[in-house]
Amino acid sequence: MELFKRTRILSFMRYSNYGVIVSAILALLALGLLFFKGFSLGIDFAGGSLVQVRYTQNAPIKEVRDLFEKEARFKGVQVSEFGSKEEILIKFPFVETAENEDLNAIVANILKPSGDFEIRKFDTVGPRVGSELKEKGILSLILALIAIMVYVSFRYEWRFALASVIALVHDVILVASSVIVFKIDMNLEVIAALLTLIGYSINDTIIIFDRIREEMLSQKTKNATQAIDEAISSTLTRTLLTSLTVFFVVLILCVFGSKIIIGFSLPMLIGTIVGTYSSIFIAPKVALLLGFDMDKYYENETRKIKKAQEKEKMRRLYESGQV
């Protein structure tokens, strides 16, 4: 299936300046949200408990909330429907208990007046563990970006590497800010979505960069802008079909999945759009803004190819006994 004819070259770089300006404005607004409002840390990072309860009748959400609010230790409790009208999810901050106290039994005792129920899941994360998980989550994102920059530098050149990382940071900032806008708790699911997004977005960028390199080395194009336009146009069908496939799969997760996975599915849904956009409009344009020179790049790549060919020739001569 081909959405766009390969012979048709679209002028992406002509409009990329507008894309960069829009992205810069959105990124600044997103940074404002991140710094001034901040994330609502979930149980994974802040510590606390998550209780899944199923009733034999419709769950009395308001009554359950009132029962917990009467207890001084359970301030800030959140009660929401989970999957069906009979099932609810209860979240509350970490509660200190004595050695002889069982938190599970305490919660069950609080819920007794609300009707016939079954506690199906009870997870608790301590503050220390939550802090460690938060540090490891942030570290994993930083290491992923560094590893990608090293890899792209080795495969292409530093301008491409820096451009790809800037595009990825742009993606992460916008998606992370959407977590605040949609009032999603920052948990491990969100970190998993961000890491998945980084891998997905860099894959798109690498495919476009590969095609750009082929166009430049073929010397069919006169300048870098033309080479980039031809490269993006030739990979556009593949990029859009892949993105649409991922988009609709994640959309189904958002619509029909339970609330417990919304921390993964919604950031991924937004990230699919943002990642595809940045691979086409941001990463190539940033490489040009960083002073990428097509002639110098061609000379360096030609030198590398000749060096590799000479090594291969010497290896063959050595194996044949001529050297």
Curated annotation (Swiss-Prot):
GO terms for biological process: intracellular protein transmembrane transport; protein targeting; protein transport; protein transport by the Sec complex. Belongs to the SecD/SecF family. SecF subfamily. Part of the Sec protein translocase complex. Interacts with the SecYEG preprotein conducting channel. SecDF uses the proton motive force (PMF) to complete protein translocation after the ATP-dependent function of SecA. Keywords: Cell inner membrane, Cell membrane, Membrane, Protein transport, Translocation, Transmembrane, Transmembrane helix, Transport. The keyword Metal-binding does not apply. The lineage of its organism: Bacteria, Pseudomonadati, Campylobacterota, Epsilonproteobacteria, Campylobacterales. This is Protein translocase subunit SecF. Pfam families: Sec_GG, SecD_SecF_C. Signal peptide: none annotated. Forms a complex with SecD. Part of the essential Sec protein translocation apparatus which comprises SecA, SecYEG and auxiliary proteins SecDF-YajC and YidC. The chain crosses the membrane at residues 19-39, 138-158, 162-182, 189-209, 244-264, 269-289. It is found in: Cell inner membrane. One of its GO terms (cellular component) is plasma membrane. One of its GO terms (molecular function) is protein-transporting ATPase activity. It is a multi-pass membrane protein.
